[in-house]
Amino acid sequence: MSRVEPIKKVSVVIPVYNEQESLPALLERTTAACKQLTQPYEIILVDDGSSDNSADMLTAAAEQPGSCVIAVLLNRNYGQHSAIMAGFNQVSGDLVITLDADLQNPPEEIPRLVKVAEEGYDVVGTVRANRQDSWFRKSASRIINMMIQRATGKSMGDYGCMLRAYRRHIIEAMLNCHERSTFIPILANTFARRTTEIEVLHAEREFGDSKYSLMKLINLMYDLITCLTTTPLRLLSVVGSVVALSGFLLAVLLIALRLIMGPEWSGGGVFTLFAVLFTFIGAQFVGMGLLGEYIGRIYTDVRARPRYFVQKVVGEQPNHNTQEEE
């Protein structure tokens, strides 16, 4: 068994987008939780182009004397996972913990994550106990988790919970990946050797609404499908073969029925032919849409634009980049 590397410093990365109401409690509770650790710590909050006063509040927190807060300000909104990657580029700890800013997952769970990670795990995931979300969000999350488990082979039960802990070598591996669309829990598990999950508390959102609208959830599902696997492309070939064979057999059946039952019967078959035709056309459009998703991602990757651009870092540590490395 390999030697377990000690954790000498803990970094907490929190993406923030229009969370000015929850920030005071978030800073207070996260700092209090980190003070329970035996290791030094830093709290990196990434403002993802907020339109409220979140950026100013983060800057003020980072500028306080003796503050362990680092404020990373992005020039616009790039999305939750890109913001977390920007935070990863600033960390100096041996263990990195991610946390949402809405306080649905309590920061008080941080010491537990550190304790479990000290047992030698590369990734410590979490499962939300008594999840306080709508039926729709729970159902969508359940479907997405099933898809991810089948694609990755990692039997983790709650990929949607961002309260997670990663060893430093996992962070370095993720920073060396330059695909434009990134889902961090999945990407981390592709590099992790030892993973585990623990149950954590989950509270109702106290301030504001979820930043994931229905359209964003749909986009997330497409991102997951196309960034996880090429299986949909293979399925297109299978579906195409099945549809073509079914069409051929149906054509043979219609010809046989016409020969047996006479031309009078065939008049009603026109509508059947139209229905079959529209079915085939619909299948073609679905296939074209999936191909378009993959081609669009290839185009985005070929342009090689940064996933984010950091406008300002307050409390900046030396030798950290303000732009994603290529």
Swiss-Prot record:
Pathway, per record: Glycolipid biosynthesis; 4-amino-4-deoxy-alpha-L-arabinose undecaprenyl phosphate biosynthesis; 4-amino-4-deoxy-alpha-L-arabinose undecaprenyl phosphate from UDP-4-deoxy-4-formamido-beta-L-arabinose and undecaprenyl phosphate: step 1/2; Bacterial outer membrane biogenesis; lipopolysaccharide biosynthesis
Record's InterPro entries?
ArnC_tfrase, Glyco_trans_2-like, Glycosyltransferase_2, Nucleotide-diphossugar_trans
Q: Where's it found, cell-wise?
A: Cell inner membrane
State the GO CC annotations: plasma membrane
Show the catalytic activity: UDP-4-deoxy-4-formamido-beta-L-arabinose + di-trans,octa-cis-undecaprenyl phosphate = 4-deoxy-4-formamido-alpha-L-arabinopyranosyl di-trans,octa-cis-undecaprenyl phosphate + UDP
Question: Could you tell me the keywords of this UniProt record?
Answer: Antibiotic resistance, Cell inner membrane, Cell membrane, Glycosyltransferase, Lipid A biosynthesis, Lipid biosynthesis, Lipid metabolism, Lipopolysaccharide biosynthesis, Membrane, Transferase, Transmembrane, Transmembrane helix
Positions of transmembrane segments: 235-255, 270-290
Under the GO molecular function aspect, what terms does this record hold?
Answer: phosphotransferase activity, for other substituted phosphate groups; undecaprenyl-phosphate 4-deoxy-4-formamido-L-arabinose transferase activity
- Enzyme class at the top of the EC tree: transferase
* Topology relative to the membrane: Multi-pass membrane protein
One GO BP annotation of this record: lipid A biosynthetic process
* Enzyme Commission number(s) from the entry: 2.4.2.53
NCBIfam families in the record, alphabetically? PRK10714.1
Functional description taken from the UniProt entry = Catalyzes the transfer of 4-deoxy-4-formamido-L-arabinose from UDP to undecaprenyl phosphate. The modified arabinose is attached to lipid A and is required for resistance to polymyxin and cationic antimicrobial peptides.
The family note in this entry says: Belongs to the glycosyltransferase 2 family.
What protein am I looking at?
Answer: Undecaprenyl-phosphate 4-deoxy-4-formamido-L-arabinose transferase
Q: Which organism is it from?
A: Serratia proteamaculans (strain 568)
